[in-house]
Amino acid sequence: MEAANCSLRVKRPLLDPRFEGYKLSLEPLPCYQLELDAAVAEVKLRDDQYTLEHMHAFGMYNYLHCDAWYQDSVYYIDNLGRIMNLTVMLDTALGKPREVFRLPTDVTAYDNRLCASIHFTSPSWVTLSDGTGRLYVIGTGDRGNSPEKWEIMFNEELGNPFIIIHSISLLKAEEHSVAILLLRIEKEELDLKGSGFYVSLEWVVVTKKKEDSKKYEITKHHVLRGKSVPHYAAIEPNGNGLMIVSYKSFKVISGDQDLEENMDEDRPEKIKVEPLYYWQQSEDDLTVTVRLPESSTKEDIQIQFLPDNINIKLKDIQVLEGKLYSSIDHEGSTWTIKENDSLEISLIKKNEGLMWPELVVGDKQGELLRDPAQCAAIAERLMHLTSDELNPNPDKEKPACNAQELEECDIFFEESSSLCRFDGNTLQTTHVVNLGSNQYLFSVIVDPKEMPCFCLRHDVDALLWQPHCSKQDDMWEHIATFNALGYVQASKRDKKFFACAPNYSYAALCECLRRVFIYRQPTPMSTVLYNRKEGRHVGQVAKQQVASLETNDPILGFQATNERLFVLTTKNLFLIRVNTEN
């Protein structure tokens, strides 16, 4: 079934066309600093991880993980292999991060490891990758109550190192399973004109064995391949589908398909089939070559030329028959058997100079052999339509666009992104949204029982979208708008992480070093403000605040909750109190 082309429906009441911008506020933000017992387990890119995709996936990795099921609880993994947790009850009485789990093996001995990754699957389940290719499914008990010992329920080596980007917990017919989405970047030996790497998304389902209440095993393993790291990828809460936002499409690789095949997207078929015949043409005639079985004779061949048709039989077996693209001189057309066991047919065109796009109408069994000299002549005839320069004279006649209105920060260098939904059973694409120039900004978990939301730039605004897998006709809901944030963030060249509060009260971004920018939603004014230009009272204002951290270490992690911002560096964890009203 062909995928449905969909669009994202913007809710007009959530837009503010009269938004005037953010006002810089100098109100101080309470900031607290914790020194870590051991440094964060940062894994730097190796010399062989040189592509942009490696940088997106691993170089910009967020080492701080927020437990969406329990507000203000964050985790990180240190270089001793410990998962450390900080749960905030009171800002002024912060305790030290505590160890909740320790990796069973010393991963620092692995030269080719990636950063360890963790995802909070449910209130009592966690999935973990140690960065060496081993997957753990861990039962944590109720993390919101008194701390319980984390217990490994499943662990298995899955090949090359990967990171976990999403997971869900499923309970169907009293059978518990955990679905996990893994990401790898692997070498593509046959890719001669690309980066030499491809991105692999693996959808793994781990299910409890019926005969053993504590034994889990892999029951499903799907692989998708693409040429770009997805901006967003998540499994639907019911496990029936997968949504991906990426600027290059992903394709499902079936289990029996050769995994070493070329990933060239322009290739229409995955398996190269030898053409039944080859043909070439000049302005006056066509030559068709058909491979014959050994020891074929003229008596085995029957050919009928008609002005608009051709019929070829070999030992009474139909080889080629159908309507020709254009008329031929059937009396002047000939055929002969060559020494290399091939049949050569010469067809004389009635309409000289007409170039045929196909030999027999609708027939796909042949291959056109193009003459290099002919291709050069065609290119020369089309030369006046092309240029080596991009719009070499934009001011001539009518310019293509008003270059003065286009700012440098508005230029997108990536290709047009798309949002795709894959069915979990058939693995076919069911819905496609062409995002065009709607730049992906960030994702956030608003409700942990739902899929993560994603934020896209629409004109100057940033719009937050909540996927709903249960609504087939309207799968993506516009739930919030951050006014002018799409435009504002584009000018922040050094931004590293982007986030927003789950209640949409503010959005925040941090740079690679030290600075954090906070953009609040418009709030009512406590005093009267008058706009003299428009002659009206201003009822509310949107504030911008800037926090500067007292550190020279690069920022490795960034998470936002309704009340706080958490910022992780190599040696410190900073807590910024953003909202004080309860």
UniProtKB/Swiss-Prot annotation:
Show where the CS domain sits. Answer: 272-360
Places the protein is found: Cytoplasm; Nucleus
Phosphoserine: residues carrying this PTM? 7, 387
Q: Which GO terms describe its cellular component?
A: cytosol; nucleoplasm
Q: Which Gene3D superfamilies match?
A: 2.60.40.790
Q: Which UniProt keywords apply?
A: Cytoplasm, Nucleus, Phosphoprotein
**Which InterPro entries does the entry link to?**
CS_dom, HSP20-like_chaperone, NUDCD1
| Signal sequence coordinates | none
Q: What is this protein called?
A: NudC domain-containing protein 1
What does the record give as the organism's lineage?
Eukaryota, Metazoa, Chordata, Craniata, Vertebrata
